[in-house]
A protein has these predicted regions:
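Accessory "access/gating" subregions that flank catalytic or transport cores
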Residues: 2-23, 32-42, 51-56, 70-164
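Short, conserved phosphate-binding/catalytic loop or strand-edge motifs used
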Residues: 45-53, 66-67, 195
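Short glycine-rich loop/turn motifs that provide flexible caps or phosphate-binding loops at active sites
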Residues: 26, 35, 174
Length: 205
């Protein structure tokens, strides 16, 4: 939709919301990590880059989803504990935003239940009105996975997969948070070797 809008001369921020029923889905949220990577230890810059990028294709919670993930990855350069990173990122979200209320709810569910499955079932019920590709319920899944992963890469991937929803997008973002925070040694070789040290990208050249 955003590409079509741009081709028709509709530029950001209008390109993100005009004729766009997917404006608050996960398409921008899944791009957040790269903005955090290029702004190590500078969550404000990461947030600004993410906001600029997200408003091309999304609006409202769709934008804040990218900001949230960018902030978490940026914080990973200066904080090693995933649970602390999540809490810090939540505190940086606008207090009056719907997105903040969702990630705050997810955090409180984790605190209340003390176990990932109960916490996730609570969130899943609370946000069942949303499409499974919407940014908000997937943000809750990220919070639950990072909260209970105990800084363990295998456990993190298992938890985020068990939550369901848009699993590949969520896994990519939270795995990046942990990898930055804990370093490459946190990832077992069995996750890396099948790729044969090769990356396929859409980027030309």
């Amino acid at each position: 939709v955003a590409l079509r809008n741009l081709k028709q001369g509709i530029y950001p921020p209008r390109s993100g919301y005009e004729n766009n029923p997917m404006r608050e889905w996960i398409g921008a949220q899944m791009r957040g990590a790269v903005c955090g990577i290029v702004a190590p230890g500078n969550p404000r810059m990461a947030a600004e880059l993410a906001f600029r990028d997200a408003q091309i294709s999304h609006s409202n919670s769709g934008i804040l989803g990218e900001v949230f993930n960018a902030v978490m990855v940026s914080l990973g350069f200066v904080e090693t504990d995933c649970k602390k990173i999540v809490r810090m990122a939540i505190d940086m979200m606008p207090k009056d935003s719907q997105y903040r209320s969702v990630v705050e709810y997810a955090w409180n569910a984790c605190e209340k239940h003390g176990e990932w499955r109960k916490a996730w079932l609570d969130c899943d019920e609370q946000f069942k009105q949303y499409n499974w590709i919407a940014a908000l319920p997937n943000a809750a899944a990220e919070v639950v996975a990072l909260y209970f992963c105990e800084n363990d890469y295998d456990k993190l991937c298992t938890l985020v997969a068990m939550c369901g929803l848009d699993v590949d997008c969520n896994a990519a973002q939270v795995a990046c948070v942990l990898a930055v925070a804990q370093g490459s040694q946190a990832i077992d070789d069995r996750w890396i070797e099948p790729f044969g040290n090769m990356m396929i990208t859409y980027v030309r050249g």
